[in-house]
From Swiss-Prot:
PANTHER family: AAA-FAMILY ATPASE, PEROXISOMAL ATPASE PEX1. GO terms for biological process: protein import into peroxisome matrix. It comes from Komagataella pastoris. This is Peroxisomal ATPase PEX1. The lineage of its organism: Eukaryota, Fungi, Dikarya, Ascomycota, Saccharomycotina. It is found in: Membrane.
Length: 1157
């Protein structure tokens, strides 16, 4: 085995053993070596003599050290270090030896006479514990023995048989001889007569096995033990275990894997081996619990003294760290693992956990005299002194005593009924920790044998034992067990069916397969990564693997040194409990991609640290990594340079069936039913591109709308009843306002929740949700994927476009049909068309057609102009194209429209700067014909298709080229009818004759013709209105009472004069005053008539003369020469080209531009 360098740290081990760093222990655990077989060689250079190296040998204690710096750490006892002259913080080279020579005889001599006196005094203890403290010896070694916790003795190794030059291993039959060393040489007779000073002492102990340990009883008996990995029930690994038989204290394991001494045992002593990540509530095996008890006792004693009461010290009530359990054979138990029943796991403090190492020891004999009285101590989180001050302040002592006795009798009766099945069938260990029992023991408790200090007993029987309530024990809330003994209160781990469906069953199954190499799950925010990860963690846990979940968002603000400490603890824990799955959620927040103009030193350091640590962990131990991020590009690229991340899975937006499934699940949790069978199908179609989070918010909004409408309906019905009994005279505004206030207060006072336990129950059998509720929820809601995406919205309707019948038909076939008839197209074996080129004469409706088709087909629309993506520098233009397609992919289904496409993607080789060449190359990459665009349709419009790079016009990119030709007579008539649809055209106007006179006009020319005619009519209307206003001013027959004199006050205060209004302004004011002059009785009717009269008076009517005048002023925008030129270009484009494409060679002609490429 390769050697490593480590730093020495002192630790109170009280033996000649050491604790090794995880870099070595991971390999030892995986190799399944016997702990007693492992010998550790230490070599170092002392400070005094730097030229000479020293070598020492010791055994391994089975522990793992925590790395506090960049170097591994090895821990040894201070007394051992002093004996071999090894200073703290010295760098040592560590080598591990497995097979060693076994010593037959070892002769030892005390270093001093005081050492001999200690050995002589504690001879029996040394004979019992020597093999527990020492694993090997070597010539001239100063061996330190620890007979008591306070004393040590030093022995010098004088001789080893067989003779060795390095070291020899002690085993059960090794004969250890200790020569006496006294101040005065005693006589031979005195030596022989001293029963405690035998020269020859033999050390024996039972054999232990792989990852085994040794336990010593009070009478010196050494018991065999083994280490095994634990899986607490319930777990799918032990699903074959009958639940009815899994009660009590039981251990399920394959007896064939145990040593013979344990195979024949019916009961074993189970304890938890403390390691990284061991829960703090794990009995006395954790030193933290002892420190916690001391601090609690000190605090309680202080409060007791202050209150003047006397309670017994609670340190006398201490949970046992070793629980006796029944050993049950299970041939299906995974190798190296054992299953722990729920009650046993609770007593050990490791309920609902996987991967803790436990020690199985042969149980001692049970108590001969069974206890007849059991004392139950309840756990409490409030000190007794505080309880005395709170409860029954004004009651007398007699009242207190009577009430306490009554409560105790009731509690004893109920507890005895619940514990009776356990007393009849289970073994019990003294001072065992009990689980919760409903409200009787809300925090658990401790069961103690009365007047018996230790031991265990076989089933007592409910008729042979009585129960007493002892003093309450103060414990923190974190110490309370999570397991409840009552069946209806047991908190099992939620199964996969209890979770919300993600419609990603195949993905979850792939991620749940524990294989070599890490996996990356990436997707946008709200795509359901956390939900998928939680289900994967649940499935992996049920397979018996330990799962460690870390949310990197919560520690992203920590410093680099703190992060290293956090991950050192995590790596140690997953290595200790292997096989493990380490989940790093939102890893990109901790090690983001390096940015060009920002400090990315910490990201690089953490990435390198991850690679170095995790690579070694995953190779040496069965550890798998699962990370999540928003995208692959958001992570530091160093992560992908090694085999740390080998698989990546993208979490895409759910399809229609998945959306329907998710919607149904959320509605079920709300106890809501659909009014129509096809309602969810329709909603699933309308929510294209919605993420699971958006669907949840949508269901919540629809549910709240449903509840709000029911509340308003109930309030309106109550209001109608009150109105019928007490009518509101004249529609009193105050009464109506009061009623409205009551309704609003009623709504605001209700608590609306999004779960099945909502405080508002519309119906015990569930509410019925309507299409209107979903329409209200969809109104104004922007999905998360579209937030921040610039989408263009056009007011142009499909009917507003005249002509272009062939182009409109092709666009609908390409864009609308795949969405409208998705089931038919989903089974199509061919790749669907995703790109269309619109070309034609200027002003023939290419841009108008593209903007209208998005609204017609219900697709999002993104319009791009050339200058938005062109940049003279290398890189930004390509980045703009990539971001553009990413925006479209996020907003899918989406139409990506490029106007004047010839200016963005001309033929390559003719750009002096090379900008458009790079843009074309990037667009070719994005519009790859082999992969296709999922949900993104590309529309390009140009009047010069011959200038576009030919590679973009090949199948798979811009598949179809559609011409927008000059309109013929029918098209011109259709265009004029569409343009004048919202205009008031006189019946005398013949649009057919107008269309006949517009030969050669484009669609834009016809629109300009209609708009010019409308402006002519507007001018005529304004002139007519002004003449009528002036005529009305000179009319003297008007009623003087209704005569209105209009003046305008000047802002100049010094000049007291009035300025008369102009006739046109006077007419406007008079019309406004006429509405105010009308009476209140017929106000509504008069207002309606006035509006109709005003609309009729102000309507603009276009006459034939207006069209004739407009026709005389409007000219064709395309000349005949330009039309013939474009016609030739289009004809050549349709019929085919000669294939003489530019080869990229720069032109040698005078004045020609040369490219930089």
């Amino acid at each position: 085995m390769n050697s490593i360098d480590a730093v020495v740290r002192y630790s109170p081990l009280r033996n000649n053993l050491c604790n090794l760093p995880s870099a070595i222990t991971t390999m030892l655990f995986s190799a399944d070596f016997n702990i007693q077989q492992i010998i550790v060689e230490l070599s170092w250079v002392p400070h005094q003599r730097a030229a000479q190296r020293r070598i020492a040998y010791c055994g391994w204690a089975g522990g793992i050290t925590k790395t506090s710096s960049s170097n591994p750490v090895i821990e040894i006892d201070r007394s051992l270090a002093s004996a071999i002259d090894l200073q703290e913080n010295v760098n040592v080279t560590v080598n591990v030896h497995i097979d060693a020579v076994k010593a037959i005889t070892v002769e030892l001599e005390p270093v001093t006479s005081n050492d001999w006196e200690i050995v002589e005094t504690h001879a029996q203890v040394l004979e019992t514990y020597l093999l527990n403290q020492t694993r090997c010896v070597y010539p001239n070694q100063v061996l330190v023995v620890y007979p008591t916790p306070q004393t040590t003795a030093r022995l010098l190794v004088k001789k080893i048989e067989p003779e060795v030059s390095t070291f020899a291993q002690l085993f059960n039959d090794t004969e250890v001889q200790i020569a006496p060393k006294v101040q005065k040489r005693p006589s031979i007779s005195s030596v022989r007569s001293d029963s405690s000073g035998h020269r020859i002492r033999r050390v024996r102990s039972s054999t232990s096995t792989a990852t085994g340990r040794r336990s010593v009883t009070n009478n010196g008996e050494v018991l065999p033990s083994m280490l095994r990995r634990s899986i607490t029930l319930p777990n799918n690994t032990y699903a074959h275990v009958n639940d009815s038989k899994s009660g009590g204290y039981k251990v399920y394991c394959n007896l064939n894997e145990l040593i013979p001494a344990l195979q024949n045992a019916h009961f074993v002593s189970v304890s938890v081996l403390v390691g990284p990540g061991t829960p703090d509530r794990t009995g006395l095996t954790s030193s933290k619990i002892k420190q916690l008890n001391d601090s609690i006792d000190q605090a309680a004693q202080t409060q007791t003294n202050a209150a003047g009461s006397s309670h017994p010290p609670e340190s006398s009530y201490t949970e046992t760290g070793k629980v006796i359990a029944e050993l049950v054979h299970d041939s299906k138990s995974p190798k190296g693992n054992v299953g722990l029943s729920e009650l046993l796991a609770c007593s050990l403090g490791i309920e609902n956990t996987v991967g803790n190492l436990i020690s199985l020891e042969q149980a001692r004999k049970p108590l001969i005299k069974k206890p007849t009285v059991l004392v139950l101590h309840k756990y409490t989180t409030v000190s007794p002194a505080s309880l005395d001050r709170v409860t029954i302040k004004h009651a007398t002592e007699e009242q207190k005593r009577v009430q306490n006795k009554k409560e105790r009798d009731t509690l004893l009766t109920q507890l005895m009924q619940l514990l009776s099945p356990l007393l009849d069938s289970c073994t019990f260990t003294n001072c065992v920790k009990l689980p919760k029992i409903g409200t009787l023991l809300p925090n658990g408790g401790l069961l103690q044998f009365k007047r018996i200090k230790s031991g265990w007993t076989t089933p007592l029987g409910k008729d042979n034992v009585s129960l007493e309530i002892g003093e309450e024990i103060l414990r923190p809330e974190s110490f309370s067990p999570s397991y409840d003994l009552l069946p209806d209160r047991k908190t099992h781990v939620r199964t996969q069916s209890d979770q919300y469906p993600t419609a990603q069953e195949n993905l979850i199954e792939s991620l749940s397969k524990i294989a070599s190499g890490g996996s990356l799950l990436f997707g946008t925010s709200g795509s359901g990564k956390s939900l998928v990860i939680s289900q994967v963690a649940q499935i992996v846990t049920n397979k018996g693997h330990f799962v460690k979940l870390l949310n990197c968002d919560k520690i992203m603000s920590e410093s680099y040194n703190n992060l290293r400490g956090i991950f050192e603890d995590i790596f140690s824990e997953v290595s200790w409990k292997a096989p493990s799955l380490l989940i790093l959620e939102d890893l990109d927040s901790l090690i983001p991609a390096e940015q060009e103009h920002s400090d990315s030193s910490q990201s690089r350091q953490l990435s390198e640290y991850f690679i170095s640590k995790l690579s070694a962990q995953t190779i040496n131990r069965d550890i798998t990594i699962l990370a999540s991020s928003k995208s692959k590009e958001s992570l530091n690229s160093l992560i992908f340079t090694t085999h740390l991340i080998e698989h990546d899975f993208q979490l895409r937006a759910p399809d229609k069936e998945a959306r329907k499934q998710i919607l149904q699940s959320y509605l079920d949790t709300l106890n809501v039913f659909c009014s129509e069978g096809e309602l969810l199908n329709n909603i699933a179609v309308e929510t294209e591109g919605y993420l699971p989070k958006d669907l949840k918010v949508l269901c919540d909004r629809a549910y709240h709308d449903l509840i709000s409408r029911d509340i308003l309906a109930d309030s309106d019905s109550e209001l109608d009843i009150e109105e019928s009994s007490t009518p509101i005279l004249n529609g009193s505004v105050g009464d109506i306002a009061n009623k409205q206030s009551e309704i609003e207060n009623g709504i605001s006072g209700l608590e609306l929740t999004n779960n099945s336990s909502s405080t508002i129950a519309v119906d015990k059998h569930g509410a019925t949700i309507q299409k209107d509720n979903f329409d209200s929820a969809l109104s104004g809601y922007i999905p998360q994927s579209l937030r921040g995406v610039k989408l263009q919205k056009s007011d142009v309707r499909w009917d507003d476009i005249g002509g272009l019948r062939d182009a409109k038909s092709i666009l609908l076939e390409t864009l609308e049909w795949p969405t409208k008839y998705a089931p038919i197209f989903s089974s199509c074996p061919l790749r669907l068309r995703s790109g269309i080129l619109l070309y034609g004469y200027p002003g023939c409706g290419k841009t108008l057609l593209a903007s209208a088709v998005a609204a017609q087909c219900g697709l999002n629309f993104i319009s791009i102009k050339g200058p938005e993506i062109l940049n003279k520098y290398i890189g930004p233009s390509e980045q703009s194209v990539r971001e553009l397609f990413e925006r479209a992919q996020a907003a899918k289904p989406c139409i990506l429209f490029f106007d004047e496409f010839d200016s963005i993607a001309p033929k390559r080789g003719h750009d002096s700067t090379g900008v458009t060449d790079r843009v074309v190359n990037q667009m070719l990459t994005q519009m790859d014909g082999a992969e296709g665009l999922d949900g993104v349709y590309v529309l390009a419009a140009t009047s010069r298709p011959d200038l576009i790079d030919s590679a973009l016009l090949r199948p798979g990119r811009l598949d179809k080229s559609v011409i927008c030709d000059m309109p013929d007579f029918d098209d011109r008539l259709d265009i004029l009818q569409s343009v004048t649809r919202n205009m008031n055209v006189s019946k005398s106007v013949n649009l057919s004759s107008v269309a006949g006179e517009c030969s050669g006009f484009s669609g834009a020319d016809l629109q300009a013709l209609a708009y010019n005619a409308y402006l002519k009519a507007v001018h005529e209307k304004l002139t007519k209105d002004e003449s009528m206003a002036m005529a009305g001013e000179m009319d003297d027959n008007d009623d003087k009472k209704r005569m209105v004199e209009c003046f305008q006050f000047s802002g100049n205060t010094e000049k007291k004069s009035l300025i008369e209004l102009k006739p046109s302004d006077r007419a406007t004011v008079i019309k406004k005053l006429e509405h105010l002059y009308q009476g209140n009785g017929n106000h509504a009717e008069g207002e309606t008539k006035s509006k109709l009269a005003t609309t009729a008076a102000n309507s603009v009517i276009i006459t034939s003369k207006d069209f004739e005048d407009s026709l005389s002023e409007t000219k064709q925008s395309i000349s005949q020469s330009e039309k013939r030129k474009l016609e030739a270009i289009y004809q050549q484009f349709i019929s085919g080209r000669d294939g003489n494409m530019p080869d990229g060679t720069a032109s040698n002609e005078i004045g020609a531009r040369s490219t930089l490429m």
